[in-house]
């Protein structure tokens, strides 16, 4: 994205770039046919279940003023509008946890003011949305999105861990409430007797932990040893919503003398009931709000605008990572302007606004990368087999595949397609008799399936159809509210805990916290797997000090959310991290260390070679290669949807650049010694499972 602070310049450039490919955004999705339903269904479940959970949370926090009907309606309406006239169609919109927190603060404030009360809460929140939209308009017009690159890893990961803590807090709070009687229920009912409250709470623990454990296990289904590839992929992609259905079914097992209200279930009015559509006419009541509160609404509006500016921009950034090789232009400024209009519309309708969400946005891009991979792969395999039947040479075969690849690319005037990767020398030697591209292909040696996997670059099917369809499906959930009310609330608390835990892998802040609690004598185990590069390049004392600073800042933000009125200010602390990172931290940490600890990309160092490689013959000749979804899962973090970058060990300016050495695997960074504490038993050769020396003499075997 080109930085520009000229008013309207960024919006104009975004519109110009996206209008050039608007037609292809629709035709590309339509040409995909029924295949587009797979990523559509995948992202629908990833969007709908959290929104339903947030609706239950809002129902409890706002005394039933806002429910799942409103959160689903907001997600559907904003998603449909954005998919049609939005700039970046890969961006997924939805009601997010920060919005729920801000609306909870505003409701508690309005409830405690006689001039507002519960009745004028939605009218006052409408004024908050009016102010929020005006601030977003100003930010978009002035090109504030040009600062998106200033949001470094420090701010992003701290914000992600804060959201994870709030998710877990809500899960724990919800489970504790399962042992208590609800505030708005008749306490004389049999299900609210002490013995039945205890039974409800214990059953809630079973359902919550059951969903949590099985959902976490299903996410790793692609690495299971059992089942076919398509079955493991199905469980990995749709296992979480499937587990929601399974544990909802388990909740209906108790019968007989068990009261009807056990376990407690999702409460929300049906969309056609009288009380469900009162908020749609809230615009009529906005003039009843006292003028002092209309002006005062600017304060929470500023916090929400800052929050949306940060969250929406980062979600769009993660959906457009350079590793996805997107060919169509970005649209940060225009999308922020559109978000202002959507926020205004939601405020006037009396529903909570939606904004770009993480990790659904990068998940959407990843699912479309899988779709594009499948479409290209099928055509290239057919082309390769046809060329081999015609006794074509390897050069002709590669040229035919390149032609088919170019034919399947969307013709863009301003950008050429990337093209297939180059053939590897080992492929040429293995598949031809003479090592010449003009030689005929040896069909017995040329593995079409595997070789094409190596040639295909990562690409994304950039289109609008999947975003539109998933938003329409979310809207269909509003009509299915009688079915949604069959879900136990305890299952939703388990899902909150799942979202909190699932967001931790890939968060380097969390990984450093775990490193601090690792015994010094066991720190070497961190090096036995792929690990972040700072583990080898930054002294442990510096890592500890940096992590303690982040933890203190995180606890300050989390503690602020507990303060009734001042809690609305927590987004300012997140934004304040930008000047803190730029001007304050360099005074306490070396710039080289900060660059590694606050890297722009998720960089990984390879595992140190503590064990001998397993000979390929021992794996068997029928070993299957990982599918494209499994490969992408290994490369992308769960917390923010980032690509992991494997890089070589870094050297300081005071050391000479190392040249290739066959014994280089035995040379470690000086910082590795600090981490070890004591040498690994496997490395020293004294442990029970330490590798035995190879019987082959390297010098003789190479001759």
From Swiss-Prot:
Region Disordered, annotated ranges: 678-703
GO CC aspect terms: plasma membrane
GO biological process: monoatomic anion transport; root development
Cytoplasmic face residues: 1-35, 97-120, 177-195, 255-289, 359-480, 579-703
Major localization class: membrane
Extracellular side: 57-75, 142-155, 217-233, 311-337, 502-557
Keyword Iron assigned: no
Transmembrane intervals: 36-56, 76-96, 121-141, 156-176, 196-216, 234-254, 290-310, 338-358, 481-501, 558-578
Localization terms from the record: Membrane
Listed GO MF terms: solute:inorganic anion antiporter activity
Entry keyword annotation includes Glycoprotein: no
Keywords of the record: Anion exchange, Ion transport, Membrane, Transmembrane, Transmembrane helix, Transport
Top-rank lineage group of the source organism: Eukaryota
Membrane topology of this protein: Multi-pass membrane protein
Family, similarity comment: Belongs to the anion exchanger (TC 2.A.31.3) family.
PANTHER family: ANION EXCHANGE PROTEIN (PTHR11453), BORON TRANSPORTER 2-RELATED (PTHR11453:SF115)
Biological function: Probable boron transporter. Boron is essential for maintaining the integrity of plants cell walls.
Protein name (record): Probable boron transporter 2
């Amino acid at each position: 994205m080109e930085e520009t602070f000229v008013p309207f310049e960024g919006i104009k450039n975004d519109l110009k770039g996206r209008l050039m490919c608007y037609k292809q955004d629709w035709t590309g999705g339509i040409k995909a046919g029924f295949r587009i339903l797979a990523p559509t269904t995948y992202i629908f479940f990833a969007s709908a279940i959290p929104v339903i959970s947030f609706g239950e949370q809002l129902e409890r926090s706002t005394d039933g003023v806002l429910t799942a009907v409103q959160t689903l309606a907001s997600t559907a309406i904003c998603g449909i509008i954005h998919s049609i006239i939005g700039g970046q169609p890969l961006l997924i919109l939805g009601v997010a946890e920060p919005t729920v927190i801000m609306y909870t603060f505003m409701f508690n404030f309005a409830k405690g003011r006689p001039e507002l009360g519960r009745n004028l809460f939605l009218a006052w929140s409408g004024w908050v949305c009016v102010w929020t939209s005006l601030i977003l308009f100003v930010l978009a017009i002035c090109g504030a999105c040009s600062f998106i690159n200033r949001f470094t890893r420090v701010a992003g990961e701290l914000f992600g861990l804060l959201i994870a803590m709030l998710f877990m807090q809500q899960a724990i709070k919800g489970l504790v409430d399962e042992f208590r009687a609800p505030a708005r229920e008749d306490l004389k009912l049999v299900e609210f007797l002490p013995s039945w409250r205890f039974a409800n709470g214990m059953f809630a623990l079973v359902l919550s932990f059951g969903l949590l454990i099985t959902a976490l296990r299903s996410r790793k289904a692609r690495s299971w040893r059992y089942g076919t590839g398509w079955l493991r992929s199905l469980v990995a992609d749709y296992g979480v919503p499937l587990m929601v259905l399974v544990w909802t079914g388990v909740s209906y097992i108790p019968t007989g003398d068990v009261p009807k209200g056990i376990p407690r279930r999702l409460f929300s009015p049906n969309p056609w009931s009288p009380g469900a559509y009162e908020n749609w006419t809230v615009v009529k009541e906005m003039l009843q709000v006292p003028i002092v509160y209309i002006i005062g609404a600017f304060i929470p509006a500023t916090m929400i605008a800052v929050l949306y500016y940060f969250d929406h921009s980062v979600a769009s950034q993660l959906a457009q990572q350079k590793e996805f090789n997107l060919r169509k232009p970005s649209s940060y400024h225009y999308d922020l302007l559109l978000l202002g209009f959507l926020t205004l519309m939601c405020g006037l309708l009396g529903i909570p606004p939606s904004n770009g969400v993480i990790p659904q946005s990068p998940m959407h891009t990843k699912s479309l990368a899988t779709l594009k991979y499948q479409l290209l792969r099928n055509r290239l395999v057919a082309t390769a087999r046809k060329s081999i039947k015609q006794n074509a040479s390897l050069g002709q075969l590669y040229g035919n595949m390149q032609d088919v690849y170019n034919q399947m690319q969307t013709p863009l005037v301003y950008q050429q397609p990337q093209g297939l990767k180059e053939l590897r020398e080992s492929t040429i030697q293995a598949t031809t008799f003479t090592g010449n591209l003009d030689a005929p292909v040896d069909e017995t040696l040329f593995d079409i399936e595997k070789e094409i996997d190596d040639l295909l670059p990562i690409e994304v099917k950039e289109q609008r159809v999947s975003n539109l369809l998933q938003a329409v499906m979310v809207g269909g959930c509003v009509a299915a509210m009688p079915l949604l009310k069959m879900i136990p609330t305890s299952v939703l608390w388990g899902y909150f805990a799942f979202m909190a835990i699932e967001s931790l892998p890939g968060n380097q802040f969390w990984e450093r916290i775990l490193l601090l609690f690792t015994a010094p004598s066991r720190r070497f185990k961190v090096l036995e797997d792929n690990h972040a590069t700072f583990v080898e390049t930054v002294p442990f004392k510096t890592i500890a000090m940096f992590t303690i600073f982040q933890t203190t800042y995180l606890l300050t933000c989390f503690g602020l959310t507990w303060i009734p009125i001042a809690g609305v200010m927590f987004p300012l602390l997140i934004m304040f991290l930008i000047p803190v990172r730029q001007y304050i931290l360099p005074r306490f940490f070396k710039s080289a260390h900060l660059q590694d600890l606050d890297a722009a990309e998720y960089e990984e160092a390879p595992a140190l070679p503590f064990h001998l490689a397993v000979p390929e013959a021992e794996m068997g000749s029928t070993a299957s290669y990982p599918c494209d979804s499994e490969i992408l899962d290994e490369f992308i973090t769960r917390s923010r949807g980032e690509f992991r970058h494997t890089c070589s060990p870094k050297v300081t300016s005071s050391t000479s650049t190392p040249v290739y050495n066959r014994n280089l695997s035995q040379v470690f960074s000086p910082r590795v010694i600090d981490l070890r504490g004591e040498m690994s038993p496997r490395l020293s050769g004294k442990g029970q499972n330490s590798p035995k020396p190879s019987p082959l003499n390297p010098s003789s075997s190479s001759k």
